[in-house]
């Protein structure tokens, strides 16, 4: 029987500002059984998608994507913030509450035609994941799915990626 993964997510009220409930996945990662269960569920979601590569945005997308890539026997490519990748990159911007931010991916991270699963810890507004998908597709990758530990349903991030197969392990 699968674990109730929500028990491993701490809800911190009024962080980082009043009115926000921060969903902290640190307890899930600190518990080997829960972390394994979450990883296994994403691996099962990915198995029939013939995934060639996992891409995850900085920084917690690495925490989700790397163990999935390992279990599937495929590579992992990090989508990073400005100045963190040493070779030629592609860039995608996304909106923040007050301004914009950007992610970068090495131009050789994805080969044309590769099947890519995009992973992150949390789906909120969908900006980060949309930017990551944009870069994968610009490089010729085929996004076969997206996977998240947590989805904040009230922020409607799912609407931005409705054309992609999606897994969220927990909804708040």
Swiss-Prot record:
Looking at the keywords, is Glycosyltransferase present?
Answer: yes
Pfam families linked to this entry: Pribosyltran
Q: Which InterPro entries is this protein grouped with?
A: Ade_phspho_trans, PRibTrfase_dom, PRTase-like, UPRTase/APRTase
- One GO BP annotation here? adenine salvage
GO-annotated cellular components:
cytoplasm
Q: What keywords are annotated for this sequence in UniProt? A: Cytoplasm, Glycosyltransferase, Purine salvage, Transferase
> What's this protein's function?
Catalyzes a salvage reaction resulting in the formation of AMP, that is energically less costly than de novo synthesis.
| Name by which UniProt lists this protein | Adenine phosphoribosyltransferase
């Amino acid at each position: 029987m699968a674990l109730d993964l929500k028990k491993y997510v701490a809800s911190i009220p009024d962080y980082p500002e009043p009115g926000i409930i921060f969903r902290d996945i640190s307890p899930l990662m600190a518990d080997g059984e829960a972390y394994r269960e979450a990883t296994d569920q994403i691996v099962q979601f990915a198995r029939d998608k013939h995934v060639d590569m996992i891409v995850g945005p900085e920084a917690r997308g690495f925490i989700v994507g790397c163990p999935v890539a390992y279990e599937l026997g495929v590579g992992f490519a990090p989508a990073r913030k400005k100045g963190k990748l040493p070779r030629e990159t592609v860039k995608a911007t996304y909106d923040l509450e007050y301004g914009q931010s950007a992610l970068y991916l090495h131009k050789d991270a994805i080969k044309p035609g590769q099947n890519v699963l995009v992973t992150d810890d949390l789906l909120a507004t969908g900006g980060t994941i949309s930017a990551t998908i944009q870069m994968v597709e610009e490089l010729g990758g085929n996004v076969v799915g997206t996977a998240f530990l947590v989805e904040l349903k009230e922020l409607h991030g799912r609407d931005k990626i409705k054309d992609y197969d999606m897994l969220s392990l927990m909804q708040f």
